[in-house]
Design a protein with these regions (language model features):
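A glycine- and small/hydrophobic-rich beta-loop-beta segment
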Residues: 1-57
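Internal helix-turn-beta structural module
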Residues: 32, 41-44, 48-148
Length: 148
């Protein structure tokens, strides 16, 4: 049912956005995967990567950390088909940093509170989106001192 899906999706986004000490809400969109399971595996590998999350917290457009997380997902990809966008800004195309890449432009985008990462695997038609938050020093302080 679409209504139930909408409510559950809204709740999932709120849970991700509500992380104590977080400063950014992140959508990781994996598109054009060979199958749903590969799309999901890559999306969660990126969304759960401490290196990706800390780079985003530091407003560092470190696309290499995203590529690392894709590789760590252990799914078959074709590097020459890989594309990565930060919001509407294309950073990687055909597995290579685009020639017109301007780090200043991407770093400016990273200052926002909502970050959309899109990873196009270019080998199918299945998509998956994962939601997460950044990993800040404040998050670590809160959770390091937390005791139940």
């Amino acid at each position: 049912d679409k209504s139930l899906h909408s409510v559950l999706l809204n709740l999932a986004k709120r849970v991700a956005a509500d992380g104590e000490g977080s400063s950014k809400f992140i959508s990781v969109n994996v598109v054009n995967a060979k199958n749903f399971f590969d799309a999901k595996k890559v999306a969660f590998s990126i969304a759960n990567s401490p290196l990706v999350k800390t780079a985003i917290a530091g407003e560092d457009p470190n696309w290499g950390r995203i590529v690392m997380a894709i590789g760590k997902a252990d799914v078959d990809i074709k590097l020459n088909k890989l594309a990565i966008n930060f919001g509407d800004i294309k950073v990687v195309e055909k597995g290579q940093l685009i020639p017109s890449y301007e780090e200043i432009e991407v770093a400016e985008y990273m200052r926002g509170e909502k970050i959309d990462l899109t990873v196009d695997l270019g080998i199918g038609n299945k998509n998956f989106t994962a939601y997460t938050m950044d990993l800040t020093k404040k998050y670590i302080e809160i959770n390091a001192d937390y005791r139940s």
